[in-house]
UniProtKB/Swiss-Prot annotation:
PROSITE patterns: AA_TRNA_LIGASE_I, S4. Residues 355-419 form the S4 RNA-binding domain. Homodimer. Keywords: Aminoacyl-tRNA synthetase, ATP-binding, Cytoplasm, Ligase, Nucleotide-binding, Protein biosynthesis, RNA-binding. A motif ('KMSKS' region) lies at residues 233-237. Belongs to the class-I aminoacyl-tRNA synthetase family. TyrS type 1 subfamily. The lineage of its organism: Bacteria, Pseudomonadati, Pseudomonadota, Gammaproteobacteria, Vibrionales. InterPro entries: aa-tRNA-synth_I_CS (IPR001412), aa-tRNA-synth_Ic (IPR002305), Rossmann-like_a/b/a_fold (IPR014729), S4_RNA-bd_sf (IPR036986), SYY-like_C (IPR054608), Tyr-tRNA-ligase (IPR002307), Tyr-tRNA-ligase_bac-type (IPR024088), Tyr-tRNA-ligase_bac_1 (IPR024107). A motif ('HIGH' region) lies at residues 41-50. This is Tyrosine--tRNA ligase 1.
Length: 422
């Protein structure tokens, strides 16, 4: 892809928050270049907040450049204080090392199928652990002005809170990230660092340190922080983060998350997250606005993102579960799909045995009293495993795979019961 076309596309998608000299950057990227993005290990899985920078690396690779994914085995031991209200809890070296391995594996498994050339994977612990304290302060620390560092908005916010402040440990984080850029520039000729807009101060420090240590000019580009139209952070639900690991967030729940995006956000998210062209997205929006009924944008977004993260099989599974719940054909689900619902798709209770339906409705919270439970049954409002139910008894042989009952009240209230295995 032509360099100008690449940056024009990023701008049209709203993916450029801040950048160093844009004309210089466009000129530089007329030739193949190397860029990187860092990912600190704060858990054993990435979440959807990491998707935009990972997808950004792919956008550059599709244009003929080389992306580097840096896992912060060293910086993850410290914790980035940028715009955090309080000090991060420090994790043990063993925990961080396990997370580093998990993230590296996850990034490779997620991204490699979508790339003609895999991302280069690096761990900043590989170079940081060999630097002595004295050498670090002499060779790197001397290039940083405390006066300038305390003027950063992210630091000023913490200093303004006497109940929190900022420790020397977190205050020094910027030095470590800056040295990463200088190191990658020296070893991989890396010319650009990308990151969230909260990383702008750290990126600028890295640009300055690289110039001082290596005598080269490098660049930075930040992505917008993803928020919903109401100003709240995107990517969290009442149940917590939306993880990319299927064992933490099932493909079904992942699919449903995107399917439930607000109309005010969905077209912006199609630009951020998908590889549909801007023209295609504009056409989707125009079609949705012209027709009466549910817009197609949420379905398209959910399909694109679930396919990208969980593959065709994950998408098809999520769609089968969604269709089965809608149609009542729950006996069409396989055991793995029922386990997805057990994991996070439906409220699930584990019971030793089930024979009394009134008790079942009380246990699942679908009825608040025995009287109400009987009324629901008499009125035909209850379905069990897709079948309308008005009896007060239930045989275990009716359980799906001898384990599961999916109980439905009305059109939208669902609960699941798993029979405890003897």
């Amino acid at each position: 892809m032509n360099s100008q076309l690449l940056f024009d596309d990023l701008a049209q998608r709203g993916l450029i928050a801040q950048t160093t000299d844009l004309e210089q950057l466009i000129a530089l990227f007329r030739q193949p270049q190397t860029l990187y993005c860092g990912f600190d290990p704060t858990a054993g899985s990435l979440h959807i907040g990491h998707l935009v920078p990972l997808i950004m690396l792919k956008r550059f690779q599709d244009a003929g450049h080389q992306g580097i994914a840096l896992i912060g085995g060293a910086t993850g031991m410290i914790g980035d204080p940028s715009f955090k209200a309080s000090e991060r809890s420090l994790n043990s070296a063993e925990t961080v090392a396990a997370w580093v391995n998990a993230l590296a594996t996850q990034i490779q498994q997620l991204m490699t199928p979508h790339l003609t050339q895999p991302l280069v994977m690096v761990n900043n612990a590989d170079w940081m652990q060999s630097i002595g304290v004295i050498a670090f302060f002499r060779d790197i620390g001397k290039h940083f002005s405390v006066n300038a560092m305390i003027q950063r908005e992210s630091v000023k916010q913490r200093l303004a809170r006497p109940d929190q402040g900022i420790s020397f440990t977190e205050f020094s984080y910027s030095l470590l990230q800056s040295y990463d850029f200088a190191q990658l520039n020296q070893t991989h000729q890396c010319a650009l660092q990308i990151g969230g807009n909260d990383q702008w101060g750290n990126i600028v420090s890295g640009i300055d340190l690289t110039r001082r240590l290596n005598g080269t000019t490098v660049h930075g580009l930040t992505l917008p922080l993803i928020t919903k139209s109401d100003g709240t952070k995107f990517g969290k639900t009442e149940g917590g983060a939306i993880w990319l690991d299927a064992a933490k967030t099932s493909p079904y729940m992942f699919y449903q998350f995107w399917l439930n995006c607000d109309d005010a956000d969905v077209y912006r998210f199609l630009r951020y997250y998908t590889f549909l062209s801007v023209e295609q997205i504009e056409q989707i929006e125009a079609t949705d606005k012209a027709q009466v009924g549910k817009p197609s944008a949420q379905r398209i977004l959910a399909e694109e993102m679930t396919r990208f993260v969980h593959g065709h099989a994950g998408l098809e599974s999520a769609q089968r579960i969604s269709q089965a719940l809608f149609s009542g054909q729950l006996n069409q689900l396989n055991l793995a799909e029922l386990k997805q619902l057990e994991q996070d798709g439906l409220p699930c209770r584990q019971l030793a045995h089930v024979s009394d339906v009134v008790t079942l409705l009380l246990e699942t919270g679908l009825a608040s009293s025995k009287r109400q439970a009987r009324e629901w049954l008499e009125n035909g409002a209850i379905r069990i495993n897709g079948e309308r139910w008005n009896e007060q008894t239930l045989a275990q042989t009716f359980a799906l795979y001898d384990q599961y009952y999916i109980v439905q009240r009305g059109k939208k209230q669902f609960a699941m019961v798993k029979l405890a295995q003897v």
